[in-house]
Amino acid sequence: IRYITPRQQFIFLQHGVIKDDLSKWLNSKKIDLFITSTKAEYDSIANDYNHYKFGKKEVVLTGLARHDALLKNNQCNARQIIIMPTWRANIVGVALGSSKRGLQSDFTQSEYFQKWNLLLNSNILQKLCEKYDYTIVFNPHPNIIPYLKDFNIPSYVKIANHNESLQELFCNSSLMITDYSSVAFEMAYLNKPVIYYQFDHEEFFNSHTYQKGYFDYKKDGFGPVVEDEESLLKELENLLQNDCNPFGIYKDNIDSTFAFKDGKCCERIYKVIKYDK
């Protein structure tokens, strides 16, 4: 952004769907064109009486450009589960500049580490994967990767290759286990369900880097919200028994969330830029 001159336009293509209140960060940017992909996201940013400074002049509902390729390369009936939690600001080291952080010496004492490490080592999880013939891929957040050596990764769990595209990971998986991450929208775009493991939901928004927005996980989510491992594994088996096809309210949410699933998001963005809305 620092290299944009006053005569140049800043077109914010985005890398994901905004579900939380990021107004404090985004309001500091001079954005001329703001791309969104769901009606709820668009309304939360462009409508009057919200926390954002942007309006219908800047914000457009076109769909994300990269979703065209995501849709095109999707693999149906992929027998892979991704475990992809986000991070917590209070369990990692302080920022040292650029994208690096110091290491937190007591990381393994955190509830975050203990809960996810227990899940990865669950005998029931392993048996479910064997019974239904699924593989598990663990994809930790970049801020958690420095602590990967602390996790006890069993042989049946693969570690995602961080040199490969995340889009490939989404396309080649049938189900996601996360906590609060917006990557759940990527799976939903591909009509794939999500399980939200929220063992620390009461403190999450008090200690993290952003504020809760319009999205309600239990009402708007793309799969069940659970608070303990036992419930998670029960919900997982329910979905595996159904070949990872979403059902009920979760299918309704997936079907109604995105404005476009037609492979023409790039075309719409191009036209908006060319004809200046």
Language-model features, listed with the residues they occupy:
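Helix N-cap/beta->alpha junction signal
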Residues: 37-40, 63-64, 142, 180, ...
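C-terminal alpha-helical cap of glycosyltransferases
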Residues: 261-277
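Structural alpha-helical scaffold elements that stabilize or flank donor/cofactor-binding regions
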Residues: 3, 27, 128, 168-169
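Catalytic binding pocket for nucleotide-activated donors in carbohydrate/polymer assembly enzymes
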Residues: 56, 151-155, 180-257
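Active-site and donor-binding regions of nucleotide-sugar-utilizing enzymes
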Residues: 1-70
